[in-house]
From Swiss-Prot:
CDD domains: cytochrome_b_C (cd00290), Cytochrome_b_N (cd00284). GO terms for biological process: mitochondrial electron transport, ubiquinol to cytochrome c. The lineage of its organism: Eukaryota, Metazoa, Chordata, Craniata, Vertebrata. This is Cytochrome b. InterPro entries: Cyt_b/b6_C (IPR005798), Cyt_b/b6_C_sf (IPR036150), Cyt_b/b6_N (IPR005797), Cytb/b6-like_sf (IPR027387), Cytochrome_b (IPR030689), Cytochrome_b_C_euk/bac (IPR048260), Cytochrome_b_N_euk/bac (IPR048259), Di-haem_cyt_TM (IPR016174). Belongs to the cytochrome b family. GO terms for cellular component: mitochondrial inner membrane; respiratory chain complex III. The gene is MT-CYB.
C-alpha cells in the first residue's frame, strides 16, 4: 500500500499533527474557539496592514494626508483601513475572552503555554500602541507623548530613556519613523510566538471544561473541530465586516480626525477602549512611579495566577463561590474600562481607586482564600 503523504511527508506531517489528526477532548465548548479566531485576526491584520503600508508615508508632514489619500483615492482603501482599525478591536475582544476562558477553566496550570500567552498579550499591546500613533492625529500624538513619558518615572535613567525612545526632545519625526518600523515588525514576532505557544499546548494537549484527563476519549481535530472553528470564523468575520461597513468610527476617537498639533492639547487624552482598564489603574495612583508599576502589574499579575491556584479542582465548573468571584472580577474590569474613559474629577477618581484595589485584591488574595474554603467545604 502506498504511504499516506499527509502522514509521511516531513512538512505535511507537522501540519497533520497540528490541524488534522490532533487528538482533541470531545467536550470542549465554543470558549475554545478563540485561539483559532486570534489566528484569523492576526492573518487579517497582517494582510490589511501590508496593503496599508504600501500607501503610507512615515513622515510627520505626510502621515495624516497619506492616510486620508488611502481612504479617498486608493481602490477600496477606505475598506482596508476600516477593517484594519476595527480588526484591532476584535483582536482584543478575542484575546480578553481567550484569557478569561483560561482563567475560568484553569488552563493556566499549563504554565509554559500560559506564560507564552502573557508574552503574546504584551507584544500585542505594544503593537497596538505603536500602530495607534501612525495616523498622526491629535489623539495619536498626545497618546504617544503621555505613554512614552511614563518611562521618565524610572529613577535616574528615566529622562535619558524617554529621549532615547523619542529620538529627540519631543515626539517628532524620528519617533514616528521608529514606531512605523516597530509596527511592521512586531506582528511577525507575534506569529513566531504563536508557534511557540502552540508547540507548548500540543505538548500537553488541550484542557476541557471538566478539567479532567480526557486521553481515553479524544477525537481527531478534523472534521469535528475544524468545522466548528469555521463557524467561528464566519461569525467573527461577519461582525468585523458589519463594524467596518456600518459604524467604522464607533470605537475610534473623534480627536483623531484633527492632524497632530503639539501646541494644542485635547481636553481629555485617553487610549483606545482596550487599554482603558489599565489606564484607569495607572491614573488611580497619585504618584508617577507608583502608577507605572501598577500599570505593569495590571497585566503581569497574570504570570502569578498559576502559583495562586489553591483548589483541588482545576476548573471553576463545580465551584460556585469561585464562579461568583470570577464574575465580580469581570464586572470590576468593566467598571475600570468605564472609569478610564471619564475625566479626572471627583466621583470617578474615588471609583477608579476602589476598582483598582478590588482588581488586585480579588486576584491575589480572594481567589486563593475562596479556593481553600471550597476545599474545606468539600472535605478535600
Amino acid at each position: 500500500m502506498a504511504p499516506n503523504l499527509r502522514k509521511s511527508h516531513p512538512l505535511l506531517k507537522m501540519v497533520n499533527n497540528s490541524l488534522i489528526d490532533l487528538p482533541t477532548p470531545p467536550n470542549i465548548s465554543a470558549w475554545w474557539n478563540f485561539g483559532s479566531l486570534l489566528g484569523i485576526c492576526l492573518v487579517t491584520q497582517i494582510l490589511t496592514g501590508l496593503l496599508l503600508a504600501m500607501h503610507y508615508t512615515a513622515d510627520t508632514s505626510l502621515a495624516f494626508s497619506s492616510v486620508a489619500h488611502t481612504c479617498r483615492n486608493v481602490q477600496y482603501g477606505w475598506l482596508i483601513r476600516n477593517l484594519h482599525a476595527n480588526g484591532a478591536s476584535l483582536f482584543f475582544i478575542c484575546i480578553y475572552l481567550h484569557i478569561g476562558r483560561g482563567f475560568y477553566y484553569g488552563s493556566y496550570l499549563y504554565k509554559e503555554t500560559w506564560n507564552t500567552g502573557v508574552i503574546l498579550l504584551l507584544t500585542l499591546m505594544a503593537t497596538a500602541f505603536v500602530g495607534y500613533v501612525l495616523p498622526w492625529g491629535q489623539m495619536s500624538f498626545w497618546g504617544a507623548t503621555v505613554i512614552t513619558n511614563l518611562f521618565s518615572a524610572f529613577p535616574y535613567i528615566g529622562q535619558t530613556l524617554v529621549e532615547w525612545a523619542w529620538g529627540g526632545f519631543s515626539v517628532d519625526n524620528p519617533t514616528l519613523t521608529r514606531f512605523f518600523a516597530l509596527h511592521f515588525l512586531l506582528p511577525f514576532m507575534i506569529a513566531g510566538l504563536t508557534l511557540i505557544h502552540l508547540t507548548f499546548l500540543h505538548e500537553s494537549g488541550s484542557n476541557n471544561p471538566l478539567g479532567i484527563v480526557s486521553n481515553c476519549d479524544k477525537i481527531p481535530f478534523h472534521p469535528y473541530f475544524s468545522l466548528k472553528d469555521f463557524l467561528g470564523f464566519a461569525l467573527m468575520l461577519f461582525l468585523l465586516t458589519a463594524l467596518a461597513l456600518f459604524t467604522p468610527t464607533l470605537l475610534g476617537d473623534p480627536e483623531n480626525f484633527t492632524p497632530a498639533n503639539p501646541l494644542v492639547t485635547p481636553p481629555h487624552i485617553k487610549p483606545e477602549w482596550y487599554f482603558l482598564f489599565a489606564y484607569a489603574i495607572l491614573r488611580s495612583i497619585p504618584n508617577k512611579l507608583g502608577g507605572v508599576l501598577a500599570l505593569a502589574a495590571s497585566v503581569l499579575v497574570l504570570l502569578l495566577v498559576p502559583f495562586l491556584h489553591k483548589s483541588k479542582q482545576r476548573t471553576m465548573t463545580f465551584r460556585p463561590l469561585s464562579q461568583t468571584l470570577f464574575w465580580i472580577l469581570v464586572s470590576n474590569l468593566f467598571i475600570l474600562t468605564w472609569i478610564g474613559s471619564q475625566p479626572v474629577e471627583d466621583p470617578f477618581i474615588t471609583i477608579g481607586q476602589l476598582a483598582s484595589i478590588t482588581y488586585f485584591t480579588i486576584i491575589l488574595i480572594l481567589f486563593p482564600i475562596i479556593s481553600s474554603l471550597e476545599n474545606k467545604i468539600l472535605n478535600y
